[in-house]
C-alpha cells in the first residue's frame, strides 16, 4: 500500500515549465541533458524489470537496431550552435527550450506510469501465480500490437524524413535564389545610378553642343560680314577701273587739244621770229641749257629702253601667271554651280552699283567742270609765260633733281614688286598643299564618322529589341502574379470549406462521445452484475485485462497526442512563415506596380528628350540650307569676279591700243618737230624745250588733281562703309541681345527639366532603398525559416533516437519477460498454495480496486474520446498544411523563373552600359576634334583683328600722304606760274607718256593683286566649306539614328504643336542671323589680302 501511495503521488505531481526560470541557453541545455540521462537510466532499469517478468520469448522486439549499436560513439547534437545569437532568434530558441522541457516532463510522466504498471504486474504475479500463462498470451498480443504500431511509426518517420529533406533542399535553393536576387538588386541599383550619371553627362554634352552651335553661328555671321566687305571692295575696284577708263578718254581729248595748240603755236612762231633778234643774247644761254637737257634726254631714253625690256619680261611672267589663273579658273568653275543660288545678294549688289553709277555720273560732271576751269587757268598761264620766262631757268635745275629722284623711286618699287610676287607665289603653293592635306583629312574623318554611325545604328536596333523583350517579360510577370493571386484566393476558399467540414466532424464526434459515455455506463452496470454472478477469481482476471487495455490505450493516446501537438506546432510555424512570405509578395507586387509607373514616366521623359533632339535636327537642317545658300552666293560672287576680270582684260586691251595710238601720235609729233627743226633750227628747239617744260608741269598738276579726286572718292566710300558697318554692328548687337535673352529662357527651361529629372531620380533611389529593405526582410525571414528547419531536424533526430531506444528497450523487455516467465512457472506452483489462503483477503481488496477502476475507466474513456477528437483535428490540420506547403513550393518555383528572367534582363542592361561607354568615348573624340577646329577659328579671328589694326594704320598713313600731296600741289602751282610755255608743252608730253606707262604697270599690279586675293579667298572658302561640311555630316549622322524614335513620339504628344510653332519662329530668326554671319565671313575673307595691295599703292604714290 505504501508503494501504491508513492506511485500515485509521483503521477499526480505537477510538471515544471522552464519559462518561469530566467536561465541562459547553456544552463537549460545542461538541465535537459541531465534529465535525458536520468530517463535513459530509468528505461534501462525498466527493461531489466521486464526481462525479470518473463518477456524473453520474443527478444527480437526489444533488440536495438544496427544503427543504434554505437550510440556512445555518436556525437551529441546540441540545440545551440553558436553562443552569439541575433536578437531575432532568442525567442525561437526559448520556444524550442520550452518545447523540449515539456517533452521531457511528458516522458517522465510516461515512465512513472510504466513503473506503476510494472509494480502492479509484479504484485499480480505474486498474488496470482496461476495466471502466468494467461499473462504470457496477453503479453504476446500486446507485443505484436506494439510491433505493428512501431512499424507504422517507423514508416511515418521515414516519410517525414524524406519530406524534411525535400523541404531542406528547397529552402537551400530558396536561400541561393534570395542571395542571387539581392545581388541582382544591388547590380540593378548600381545600373540605375550609372544610368542617372550617364543621363547627366549626356545633358552636359548637349549643353556643350548647343554652345558650340551658337559659336559656329556667330562665326558664320562674322564670315558673312567679311564676305560683304570683300564684295564691296571688289565693287570699289570695278569703280576704280571705270574711273581709269574715263581718265584715258579725258587724256585722248587733251591730246587732241594739244594738237590744236601746236598748230596755234606754229602761227605764233612766225610772230615770235621778230622778237628773236632782240633775244639772241638770251638764246646763247638757252643753248647751253638745251645741251644739258639733251644729255638728260639721252639718259632718259636709255632708262626708258631698259624699262621697256623689263616690261616685256614682266609681260612674260604675267602670261605664265595668266595660264595658272586659267587653271585656277577651271577649278573655280566647279564652284560656279553653287554660286547660282546667290542671286538675291547679286540683286542687292546691282542696286548698290546703280547707286554708285549715279554717284559716278555726278563725279564725272564735276570733273568736266574742273577740266574747263583748268583750261581757263592754262590760257591765263600762257599769257603769263612771257613774263615768267626768266625764272624758268632756275626752276629747271630743281625739276631735273626731282626727275632723278622719281626714277630712283620707280626702281625701288620695281624691286619691291618682284619680292612681293615671289612671296605671293610661295603662299599660293602653300595654300595648294594645305588644301590637299585638308581634303585627305576630311576623307579620313568621313570614313570614321560613317563607321561610327553604322555601329551606333546597330546598337540602337539591338537596344530596341532588348526593350521589346523586356516589355514582353514584364507582361509575362504580370500574368504570373495574377495567376498566383487567383490561386491564393482559391486556396482560401478551399480552407474555409475544410473548416466547415471539420466543424461538422467535431459535432459528429461529440455525438459519438456521448454515445460512448452511455455505453460505458451500461458496461459499468453489467460489470457490477457480473461481479455478483461470476467467481471472484474470473472477475478479477477480466478486470485486470480491461485495466491493462485501458492503460495501454491511454499511454498510446498520450504518446500520439504529444507527437501530433509537436507536428501541429511545427506546421503552424510554417504557416506563419508562409503568411509572412505572402505578405512580402504582396508588398513586392505593390513595389512592382510603383516601378511600372516610374518606368512609364521615364519613357515619357525620354520621348520629350527625343522631341528636343528632333528639333535640334531641324535646326541643323536649316543651318545646312543656309550653308548651301552661302555656297550659291559664293559661286555668284566668283561669277562676278570672272566678269570683272574679263572687263579688266578688255580695259587692258584698250589701254594697249591707246598706247599704240599715242606712240603713233608721238612719232608723228617727232616727225613734225624734225621738219620744224629743218625750217626754224634753233628757234624751234627752244620752243620745244619750253613746251616740254610746260607739259611736264601740266602733267604734274593733272596727276595731283587725279590723285586728289581719287583720295576724296576713297575717303567718301570709306565713310559710307564706316556708316554701314556701324549700322550693321548695331543690328548685330541687337540680334546678340535677342539671342542672349532666348538663351536665358532656354537655360531656364533646361534647368527646370533637369530639376524634374533629379526629383524623379530621387524617387527612384528611394524606391530602390525600399526594395533593398524588403529584400533584407525577406532574407531575415529566410534565415528564421532556416533556424526553424534546423530545430525541426534536431527534434526529428532526437525522436529517432528515442524511437530506437524504445525499440531496444522493447526487445530487452521481451527477452527479460521470457526469462521471467520460466522463473515464474516454477514459482506459480508454490504460489498456488499461498493463493488459496490469501484469496479471501484479496476479495476485499479486489472489491475496493474494482470501485476505483470503474472511476478510472470513466476518466480514461472520457480522455480517450478527447484524444481521438484532437487527433482527428490534428490530422486534418496536417493535411491542410501539406496542401499549403505544395502551393508554396509552386510559388517558389514561379519566383525562381522570375529571378532567372530578371538576371537575363540585368545582363542585357550591363551590355547596354558597355555600349553607352563606347559611345561616350567616341563623343569625347569628336569633342576634341571640335576643340581643334575652334582653336583654328580663334587663330583666324586673331589674324582678322590684326588686319583691321593694319587697315586703321594704313588709313592714317593715307591721310598723312594726302596732306603732304596737298602741300606739294600748292608748291607745284607756285612753280608752274614761273615756267615757260615751251617747256610746259614738252614736259606735258613726256609726263603723259610716263603716266601711261605707270598706269599700265599699276593696272597689271592691281590685276595681279586682285587675282592673288581671289585665289586666297577661294582657298580659304574651300577650307571653310570643307570644315562646315564635316561638322554638318557629324551632326547629321549623330542625330539621324534618333530621328525615327522622335517622329513616333511626336505623334503621341499633340500638346507639342504650340512648341513647334514657337521653334519655327526661332528657326527663321536663326536663318536671318546665319545670313548675317555669312556676310561677315565674306568680308573677312575679302579684307585679308587688302593690306598688301594698299602697301604697294602707298609705295607707288
Swiss-Prot record:
- Gene, per the UniProt record: CCDC150
On whether Coiled coil is a keyword of this UniProt record, the answer is yes
Q: Where is this region: Disordered?
A: 1055-1101
Matching InterPro entries: CCDC150
Q: Does the keyword Zinc-finger apply?
A: no
Species source reads: Homo sapiens
Q: Where is the composition biased (Basic and acidic residues)?
A: 1055-1071
Q: Per UniProt, which keywords does this protein have?
A: Coiled coil
The residue stretches assigned to a coiled coil in this entry are 106-299, 398-680, 712-940, 970-1033
Name of the featured protein = Coiled-coil domain-containing protein 150
Amino acid at each position: 500500500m505504501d508503494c501504491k501511495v508513492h506511485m500515485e503521488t509521483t503521477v499526480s505531481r505537477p510538471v515544471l515549465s522552464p519559462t518561469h526560470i530566467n536561465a541562459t541557453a547553456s544552463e537549460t541545455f545542461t538541465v535537459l541533458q541531465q534529465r535525458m540521462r536520468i530517463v535513459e537510466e530509468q528505461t534501462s532499469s525498466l527493461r531489466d524489470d521486464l526481462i525479470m517478468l518473463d518477456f524473453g520469448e520474443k527478444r527480437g522486439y526489444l533488440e536495438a537496431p544496427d544503427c543504434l549499436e554505437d550510440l556512445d560513439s555518436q556525437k551529441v547534437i546540441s540545440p545551440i550552435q553558436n553562443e552569439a545569437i541575433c536578437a531575432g532568434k532568442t525567442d525561437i530558441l526559448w520556444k524550442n527550450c520550452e518545447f523540449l522541457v515539456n517533452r521531457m516532463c511528458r516522458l517522465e510522466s510516461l515512465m512513472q506510469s510504466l513503473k506503476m504498471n510494472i509494480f502492479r504486474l509484479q504484485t499480480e504475479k505474486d498474488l496470482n501465480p496461476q495466471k502466468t500463462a494467461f499473462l504470457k498470451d496477453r503479453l504476446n498480443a500486446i507485443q505484436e500490437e506494439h510491433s505493428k504500431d512501431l512499424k507504422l511509426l517507423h514508416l511515418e518517420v521515414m516519410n517525414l524524413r524524406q519530406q524534411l529533406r525535400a523541404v531542406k533542399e528547397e529552402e537551400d535553393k530558396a536561400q541561393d535564389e534570395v542571395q542571387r536576387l539581392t545581388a541582382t538588386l544591388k547590380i540593378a541599383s548600381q545600373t540605375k545610378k550609372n544610368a542617372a550619371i550617364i543621363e547627366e553627362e549626356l545633358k552636359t554634352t548637349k549643353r556643350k553642343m548647343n554652345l558650340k552651335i551658337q559659336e559656329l553661328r556667330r562665326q558664320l555671321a562674322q564670315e558673312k560680314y567679311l564676305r560683304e566687305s570683300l564684295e564691296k571692295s571688289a565693287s570699289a575696284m570695278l569703280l576704280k577701273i571705270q574711273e581709269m577708263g574715263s581718265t584715258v578718254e579725258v587724256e585722248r581729248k587733251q591730246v587732241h587739244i594739244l594738237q590744236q595748240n601746236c598748230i596755234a603755236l606754229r602761227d605764233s612762231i612766225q610772230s615770235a621770229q621778230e622778237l628773236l633778234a632782240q633775244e639772241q643774247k638770251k638764246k646763247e644761254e638757252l643753248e647751253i641749257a638745251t645741251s644739258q637737257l639733251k644729255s638728260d634726254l639721252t639718259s632718259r631714253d636709255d632708262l626708258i629702253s631698259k624699262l621697256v625690256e623689263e616690261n616685256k619680261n614682266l609681260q612674260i611672267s604675267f602670261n605664265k601667271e595668266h595660264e595658272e589663273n586659267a587653271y585656277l579658273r577651271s577649278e573655280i568653275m566647279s564652284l560656279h554651280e553653287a554660286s547660282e543660288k546667290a542671286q538675291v545678294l547679286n540683286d542687292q549688289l546691282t542696286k548698290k552699283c546703280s547707286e554708285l553709277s549715279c554717284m559716278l555720273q555726278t563725279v564725272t560732271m564735276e570733273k568736266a567742270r574742273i577740266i574747263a576751269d583748268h583750261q581757263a587757268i592754262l590760257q591765263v598761264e600762257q599769257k603769263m609765260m612771257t613774263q615768267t620766262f626768266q625764272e624758268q631757268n632756275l626752276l629747271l635745275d630743281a625739276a631735273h633733281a626731282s626727275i632723278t629722284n622719281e626714277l630712283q623711286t620707280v626702281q625701288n618699287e620695281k624691286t619691291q614688286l618682284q619680292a612681293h610676287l615671289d612671296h605671293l607665289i610661295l603662299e599660293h603653293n602653300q595654300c595648294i598643299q594645305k588644301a590637299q592635306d585638308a581634303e585627305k583629312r576630311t576623307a579620313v574623318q568621313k570614313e570614321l564618322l560613317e563607321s561610327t554611325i553604322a555601329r551606333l545604328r546597330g546598337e540602337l536596333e539591338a537596344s530596341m529589341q532588348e526593350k521589346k523583350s523586356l516589355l514582353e517579360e514584364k507582361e509575362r510577370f504580370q500574368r504570373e502574379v495574377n495567376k498566383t493571386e487567383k490561386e491564393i484566393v482559391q486556396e482560401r476558399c478551399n480552407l474555409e470549406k475544410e473548416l466547415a467540414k471539420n466543424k461538422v466532424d467535431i459535432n459528429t464526434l461529440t455525438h459519438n462521445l456521448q454515445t460512448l459515455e452511455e455505453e460505458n455506463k451500461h458496461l459499468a452496470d453489467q460489470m457490477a452484475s457480473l461481479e455478483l454472478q461470476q467467481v471472484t477469481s474470473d472477475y478479477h482476471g477480466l478486470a485486470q485485462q480491461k485495466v491493462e487495455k485501458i492503460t495501454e490505450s491511454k499511454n498510446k493516446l498520450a504518446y500520439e497526442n504529444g507527437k501530433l501537438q509537436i507536428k501541429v506546432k511545427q506546421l503552424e510555424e510554417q504557416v506563419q512563415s508562409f503568411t509572412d512570405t505572402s505578405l512580402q509578395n504582396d508588398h513586392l507586387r505593390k513595389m512592382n506596380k510603383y516601378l511600372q509607373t516610374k518606368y512609364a514616366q521615364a519613357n515619357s521623359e525620354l520621348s520629350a528628350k527625343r522631341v528636343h533632339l528632333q528639333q535640334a535636327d531641324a535646326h541643323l537642317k536649316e543651318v545646312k540650307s543656309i550653308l548651301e545658300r552661302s555656297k550659291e552666293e559664293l559661286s555668284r560672287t566668283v561669277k562676278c569676279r570672272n566678269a570683272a576680270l574679263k572687263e579688266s582684260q578688255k580695259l587692258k586691251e584698250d589701254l594697249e591700243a591707246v598706247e599704240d595710238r599715242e606712240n603713233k601720235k608721238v612719232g608723228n609729233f617727232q616727225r613734225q618737230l624734225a621738219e620744224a627743226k629743218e625750217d626754224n633750227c634753233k628757234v624751234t628747239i627752244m620752243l620745244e624745250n619750253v613746251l616740254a617744260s610746260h607739259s611736264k608741269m601740266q602733267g604734274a598738276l593733272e596727276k595731283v588733281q587725279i590723285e586728289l579726286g581719287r583720295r576724296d572718292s576713297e575717303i567718301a566710300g570709306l565713310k559710307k562703309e564706316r556708316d554701314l558697318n556701324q549700322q550693321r554692328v548695331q543690328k548685330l548687337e541687337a540680334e546678340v541681345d535677342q539671342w542672349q535673352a532666348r538663351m536665358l529662357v532656354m537655360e531656364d527651361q533646361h534647368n527646370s527639366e533637369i530639376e524634374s529629372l533629379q526629383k524623379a531620380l530621387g524617387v527612384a533611389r528611394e524606391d530602390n532603398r525600399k526594395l533593398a529593405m524588403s529584400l533584407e526582410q525577406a532574407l531575415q525571414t529566410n534565415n528564421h525559416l532556416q533556424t526553424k528547419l534546423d530545430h525541426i531536424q534536431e527534434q526529428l533526430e532526437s525522436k529517432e533516437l528515442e524511437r530506437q531506444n524504445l525499440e531496444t528497450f522493447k526487445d530487452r523487455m521481451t527477452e527479460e519477460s521470457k526469462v521471467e516467465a520460466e522463473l515464474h512457472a516454477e514459482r506459480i506452483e508454490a504460489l498456488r498454495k499461498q493463493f488459496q489462503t490469501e484469496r479471501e483477503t484479496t476479495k476485499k481488496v479486489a472489491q475496493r480496486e474494482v470501485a476505483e477502476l470503474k472511476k478510472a475507466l470513466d476518466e480514461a474513456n472520457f480522455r480517450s474520446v478527447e484524444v481521438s477528437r484532437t487527433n482527428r483535428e490534428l490530422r486534418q490540420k496536417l493535411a491542410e498544411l501539406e496542401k499549403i506547403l505544395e502551393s508554396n513550393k509552386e510559388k517558389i518555383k514561379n519566383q525562381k523563373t522570375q529571378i532567372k528572367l530578371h538576371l537575363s534582363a540585368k545582363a542585357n542592361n550591363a551590355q547596354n552600359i558597355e555600349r553607352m561607354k563606347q559611345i561616350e568615348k567616341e563623343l569625347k573624340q569628336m569633342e576634341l576634334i571640335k576643340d581643334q577646329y575652334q582653336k583654328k577659328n580663334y587663330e583666324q579671328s586673331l589674324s582678322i583683328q590684326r588686319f583691321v589694326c593694319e587697315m586703321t594704320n594704313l588709313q592714317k598713313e593715307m591721310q598723312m600722304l594726302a596732306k603732304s600731296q596737298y602741300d606739294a600741289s600748292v608748291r607745284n602751282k607756285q612753280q608752274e606760274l614761273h615756267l615757260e610755255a615751251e617747256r610746259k608743252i614738252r614736259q606735258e608730253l613726256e609726263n603723259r607718256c610716263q603716266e601711261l606707262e605707270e598706269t599700265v604697270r599699276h593696272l597689271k599690279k592691281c590685276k595681279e593683286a586682285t587675282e592673288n586675293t581671289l585665289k586666297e579667298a577661294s582657298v580659304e572658302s574651300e577650307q571653310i566649306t570643307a570644315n562646315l561640311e564635316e561638322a554638318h555630316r557629324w551632326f547629321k549622322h549623330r542625330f539621324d539614328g534618333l530621328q525615327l524614335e522622335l517622329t513616333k513620339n511626336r505623334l503621341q504628344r499633340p500638346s507639342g504643336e504650340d512648341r513647334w510653332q514657337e521653334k519655327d519662329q526661332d528657326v527663321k530668326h536663326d536663318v536671318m542671323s546665319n545670313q548675317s554671319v555669312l556676310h561677315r565671313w565674306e568680308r573677312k575673307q575679302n579684307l585679308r589680302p587688302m593690306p598688301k595691295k594698299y602697301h604697294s599703292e602707298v609705295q607707288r604714290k
